[in-house]
């Protein structure tokens, strides 16, 4: 199967690479199947490309690359939803918003991380309650460098 992404062009989709989000992502419950694509070499960015809606993709990061102290404890229900028993086996990513392609103004949703079971290829976006994390945490500081540990 092939899809055409406005960002990536034509992509060959291998069924065994698709990550299924049984409940979709928040605000996108109709889209349940995605590919996780690595960004350009040397960048910390990943892309979650919808298989069902070709013009839909999300910029993602491993939050610990920017926020050393970022830690979450998914509930046992959240882990069960993606067939995991231990949270340390999960891949944790967060969604990045880049306003008007201005990377220096990018924000990251630390309050709503995505957890993925890489073996079962199942994912879920969770909401951390209670949490000091925000949905629009600056990715970079005022000097345009990584906002390391700035949570």
From Swiss-Prot:
Keyword set, alphabetical order: Bacterial flagellum biogenesis, Chaperone, Cytoplasm, Translation regulation
Which GO cellular component does the record give, naming just one?
A: cytoplasm
Cell compartments where the protein resides: Cytoplasm
State the disulfide connectivity: none
Q: What is its main location?
A: cytoplasm
Pfam families with a match to the protein in the record: FliW
**Where exactly are the transmembrane stretches of this chain?**
none
A single Gene Ontology biological process assigned to it is:
regulation of translation
**Do the record's keywords include Chaperone?**
yes
UniProt cross-references to HAMAP family, sorted A to Z: FliW
Function of the protein: Acts as an anti-CsrA protein, binds CsrA and prevents it from repressing translation of its target genes, one of which is flagellin. Binds to flagellin and participates in the assembly of the flagellum.
Instruction: Give the record's subunit note.
Output: Interacts with translational regulator CsrA and flagellin(s).
Q: Which NCBIfam families match?
A: PRK13285.1-1, PRK13285.2-4
Identify its protein family: Belongs to the FliW family.
Name it.
Answer: Flagellar assembly factor FliW
* Lineage summary: Bacteria, Bacillati, Bacillota, Clostridia, Natranaerobiales
Q: Which gene encodes it?
A: fliW
